[in-house]
Amino acid sequence: MVKPEKFIPKAIEKISKEIKDGKAIIALSGGVDSSVCAELAYRAIGDRLQPIYIDTGLMRKGETERIRHIFSHMNLDVVYAKDRFLAALAGVTDPEEKRKAIGETFIRVFEEEARKLAADYLIQGTIYPDRIESEGGIKSHHNVGGLPSVMDFKKIVEPIEDLYKDEVREVAWALQLPDEICERMPFPGPGLAVRVLGEVTEEKLEVAREANFIVEEELLERFCPWQTFAAVLGKGTGVKGDVRAYGWIVAIRAVGSRDGMTAEALELPWEVLKHLESRITSEIPKVARVVYDITPKPPATIEFE
């Protein structure tokens, strides 16, 4: 288990030595991983760090506004790149190809920002489970196996690459980051793209965005899951009034875990599941069916793609 009081000074020293007098940019998503990296890097190199938030169009409801507010003190640069990401994902259905398309677009946008800032280094919040899943061939992560092989940075610096998620949270508390960051539920780097099975379209993203908002609103505070979300699986037959309808199938996922390496589905009360179904199908008219995924990890991963 990590000892934050020892890890923090060593991480700051390592960042200082790797970047020296150079400038660095960081992919700041607002998650605990990137937030911890940003704070460590800021303590190491100060104003030579430029945090950048990319609005990919694949984020949760209200995400960009929330991140802009929380990190306004760090001179956060917000880059709007929704059209580029959707163009890169057009026609792509294979999960690995989707992740790699997102990874390549992600790094190219950052390269462009780095050139403007004359930054030579990219800081990333890769954690140990990301590397294990990528190296083991389970699935690539946008900041590991999904990155292009040729990049315009001297080096990628990964300060927390040997930590598990619960250890990152301990470091976040020790750094005195806001509670909202320390307790923030994991959200995948590729965003809602991996919660939309098959090709990513604006319609499917909007359904996923609204469904995720409902699921988080209903389950986070009451059940404290390690992770919970909604995914759009495809289309199925339903009934709206007395008319046959063909609408989206939404799957709800809620799991408990210590570090993300293994996970068990939460045994949610039946009345809670019924309430979720009612809210999702009534508030999102394009949804025809709601299911609850009870599969543990393994054999499944937590996310659907």
From Swiss-Prot:
Known pathway: Purine metabolism; GMP biosynthesis; GMP from XMP (L-Gln route): step 1/1
Keyword Nucleus: no
Key word Magnesium present: no
Gene3D superfamilies: 3.30.300.10, HUPs (3.40.50.620)
Gene Ontology, cellular component aspect: cytosol
UniProt keyword annotations, A-Z: ATP-binding, GMP biosynthesis, Ligase, Nucleotide-binding, Purine biosynthesis
One family name in Pfam for this protein: GMP_synt_C
The enzyme's E.C. designation: 6.3.5.2
GO molecular function, one term: GMP synthase activity
Boundaries of every GMPS ATP-PPase domain copy: 2-184
InterPro entries per the UniProt record, alphabetical: GMP_synth_C, GMP_synthase_B, GMPS_ATP_PPase_dom, Rossmann-like_a/b/a_fold
Disulphide linkage map: none
Substrates-to-products reaction catalysed: XMP + L-glutamine + ATP + H2O = GMP + L-glutamate + AMP + diphosphate + 2 H(+)
Role description: Catalyzes the synthesis of GMP from XMP.
Assembly and interaction partners: Heterodimer composed of a glutamine amidotransferase subunit (A) and a GMP-binding subunit (B).
NCBIfam families to which the protein is assigned, alphabetical: guaA_Cterm (TIGR00884)
PANTHER family in the cross-refs: GMP SYNTHASE [GLUTAMINE-HYDROLYZING] (PTHR11922:SF2), GMP SYNTHASE-RELATED (PTHR11922)
Protein name as annotated: GMP synthase [glutamine-hydrolyzing] subunit B
Native species: Methanosarcina mazei (strain ATCC BAA-159 / DSM 3647 / Goe1 / Go1 / JCM 11833 / OCM 88)
Species classification: Archaea, Methanobacteriati, Methanobacteriota, Stenosarchaea group, Methanomicrobia
Name of the gene this protein is made from: guaAB
